[in-house]
Amino acid sequence: MTDSMQILIVEDEMLLAMDMEAMVEDSGHRVLAEAASLQDVEALPDDLNPQLAFVDIHLAHDSNGLDVCRYIRTHWPDALIVFVTANVSKIPADFSGAHGVIAKPFSHAGVVNAINYLANGVFAPPPSMPRPASLIPSPNLEARWMKTVA
């Protein structure tokens, strides 16, 4: 087991958010906060400083995950951002700066494996374990880890 990560969950469907929270905790990590919209994320304390954020694309109050991603990159630039969505085709080629995506529907094991892989890379980049099939990485992920190692 790697060190424990501090994780933000941005998901407007309460049952999915609760499921994600259980998976995070089952992985030995901690949920710092949950949010259902960009407005909820903007209301979080500036010193929250998550290490990983799971972000849905379609959110409450006519907000979207792409805007949340930009906000997180500005306010918590060290956070890894992973979209969790059934709408993978809605993610732009540059991932809006995010580090990867997990497609819905997802399996418990798939999310747990992705969390552990990302945690391994956060604390000792690049990860020493193989990337799980559940995580579709963006070019930003490898670039971040190569920059950290250099």
Region locations from a protein language model:
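Short amphipathic alpha-helix used as the core "switch/output" element in two-component signaling
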Residues: L66-P77
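Two-component/phosphorelay signaling modules centered on CheY-like receiver
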Residues: E13-A33
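CheY-like receiver
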Residues: N113, N120-A150
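Conserved acidic carboxylate
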Residues: E11, T85
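Receiver (REC) domain switch/active-site region of two-component response regulators
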Residues: S107, N116
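Active-site residues of response regulator receiver
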Residues: D56-H58
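A Lys-centered signature of the CheY-like receiver
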Residues: K104
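Acidic, metal-coordinating helix/loop segments flanking the phosphotransfer/catalytic sites
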Residues: E34-L52
